[in-house]
Curated annotation (Swiss-Prot):
Pfam families: HK (PF02110). GO terms for molecular function: ATP binding; hydroxyethylthiazole kinase activity; magnesium ion binding. Its cofactor is Mg(2+). NCBIfam families: PRK09355.1, thiM. Belongs to the Thz kinase family. This is Hydroxyethylthiazole kinase. The keyword Oxidoreductase does not apply. It comes from the Bacteria.
Length: 276
C-alpha cells in the first residue's frame, strides 16, 4: 500500500468531480455506451464525435482525448489522426488504447501510424498489445491477451513497460490480473480487481476512458493512469461483493454503481498499490 500515491489519487478524484472534464472519445461501437456511462459515473462529461468534419473541433474544446481502435475502420482513422494532432497542438492529453494490436495488418499499420503522428500521453493495453508495440513478438488472441503473454512475470512486465515508456516518452500501462504502470522512471504495480471483470465486454475500454477523465483533470499523467486503473479494479471488487453471485449482467451494472459511489476514503482503504 502506498499512502502517498493513494492520497494523490483521492485528490485527483475530487478534481474530476469539481472540474467535470470534457473527455472526447473516438472509440468503438461495441463499448461506446459503457464508456459514456462510466465517465458520467466518475464525474466527467463524455462526448463521442468521430466524423472528420468535426473531430478536431471537438478535441479543441475538450480536456482529454481518448483513442480506441476496437472496431477500426478507414473513416475514423483520419479523425483519430486529426484529433490527435489538434490535442498535441493544444497540450491536451491523449490516451491511446491499441485494441487488438498484433491481430491484423490493418490494426498493426494503424497503431504504427498513430504512434508516429500523434504524441501519446498514456498508452494502455494488455500484455499482448504492449509486447507487440514493443517489437517483442506477442501472440494476441483477438482483442484479448494470449494465455502465454498473460503469464508474463512481473519482472519482465516491468521491463517491458519501462522500456516502452522511455522509447515513446509517455506513461505505459499494462493491464491484466496484475497491472503494471510506468512512465520510464516511476513504476507501480496494482493488484486490485477480480477475474469476473474479464466476463464483461468493455471493462478495458471503460478503464481507458477513466484514465482520460483523470488525465483531463490533472497534469501528472502517470498518476492519471494509476487513478483510472485502480478505480476500475476497486469498483470491480465492490461489484463482485454486491452482485457477483447474481450474474454478469448485474455485475456489469454494479461496476458503474461502484464507480459513481467511489470516494477517496474507499481508495485509501482498499488500494493494493506497490511502488517499485
Amino acid at each position: 500500500m502506498s499512502n502517498e500515491i493513494s492520497i494523490k489519487i483521492g485528490s485527483l478524484l475530487n478534481e474530476v468531480r469539481n472540474k467535470k472534464p470534457l473527455v472526447h472519445n473516438i472509440t468503438n461501437y461495441v463499448t461506446v455506451n459503457d464508456c459514456a456511462n462510466i465517465l458520467l459515473a466518475i464525474g466527467a462529461s463524455p462526448i463521442m464525435a468521430d466524423d472528420i468534419k468535426e473531430a478536431a473541433d471537438i478535441t479543441k474544446i475538450s480536456s482529454a482525448l481518448v483513442i480506441n481502435i476496437g472496431t477500426l475502420n478507414e473513416r475514423t482513422i483520419e479523425s483519430m489522426i486529426a484529433s490527435g494532432k489538434k490535442a498535441n497542438e493544444l497540450n491536451i492529453p491523449v490516451v491511446f488504447d491499441p485494441v487488438g494490436a498484433g491481430a491484423s495488418e490493418f490494426r498493426n499499420s494503424t497503431t504504427k501510424r498513430l504512434l508516429e503522428e500523434v504524441k501519446i500521453s498514456v498508452l494502455r493495453g494488455n500484455m499482448s498489445e504492449i509486447k507487440f508495440i514493443s517489437g517483442l513478438g506477442s501472440t494476441t488472441k483477438g482483442v484479448d491477451a494470449s494465455e502465454n503473454d498473460a503469464r508474463t512475470g512481473n519482472d519482465e512486465g516491468i521491463d517491458v513497460a519501462k522500456n516502452l515508456a522511455k522509447k515513446l516518452q509517455c506513461t505505459v500501462a499494462i493491464t491484466g490480473a496484475t497491472d503494471i504502470i510506468s512512465d520510464g522512471e516511476r513504476v507501480v504495480i496494482l493488484e486490485n480487481g477480480t477475474k469476473m471483470l474479464s466476463n464483461v465486454t468493455g471493462t478495458g475500454c471503460m478503464t481507458t476512458a477513466l484514465i482520460g477523465a483523470f488525465c483531463g483533470a490533472g497534469s501528472d499523467y502517470f498518476i492519471g493512469a494509476v487513478s483510472g486503473i485502480i478505480s476500475m479494479g476497486i469498483s470491480g471488487e465492490i461489484a463482485l461483493d454486491k452482485a457477483g453471485k447474481i450474474g454478469t449482467g448485474s455485475f456489469h451494472i454494479a461496476i458503474i454503481d461502484a464507480i459513481s459511489n467511489l470516494t477517496s476514503n474507499i481508495i485509501e482503504k482498499m488500494n493494493k498499490i506497490k511502488e517499485i
